[in-house]
Amino acid sequence: MSANDAANVIAEQIAGSQDAFVEMMNQEAQKIGATNTHFVNANGLHSEDHYTTVYDLYLMFNAAMQHEEFLQMLQEKEYQASYQAADGTTVEAVWSTSNQFTKGDVTVPDGVTAVGGKTGTTTAAMSCLVQLFEDAQGEQYVAIILGCKERGILYQEM
């Protein structure tokens, strides 16, 4: 589930501006060792100077997995919220995951559980997926695919 507009609002609420929040993101990336990552916006949409690597995505995902709330969000098929719009009206919204593992549209081998993951798609990045799996012994594995031309193939390759 993505909500680019929500990411921007959260950035402004936390840091006072999107630029200040992006600076915090870049500092945190450096802190966890994601030294080949540079953010220019909070929402992840394409920008020429906005980049990362598979390894840095792993580091960021691994850091996020240390928070129980993040692990819970990864497993959600949908999220419902009620919020107040700028004009004062109450808006009811539902966001649904596009992750085919989470939705149950794609199966995994016996003994493996698709715990959850994050999809991302832009024209420049194409279809991307960072996915957490767990085997029957409880061992966890993070798999990452970037730049897949077709979303359907993304899940076959994973």
Where are these regions (language model features)?
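Active-site-adjacent loops and short helices of periplasmic peptidoglycan-processing enzymes
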Residues: M1-Y55, A64-E68
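Domain-terminus/edge residues, biased toward the C-terminal soluble/receptor-binding domains
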Residues: A34-T35, D49-Y51, Y55-D56, F61-M158
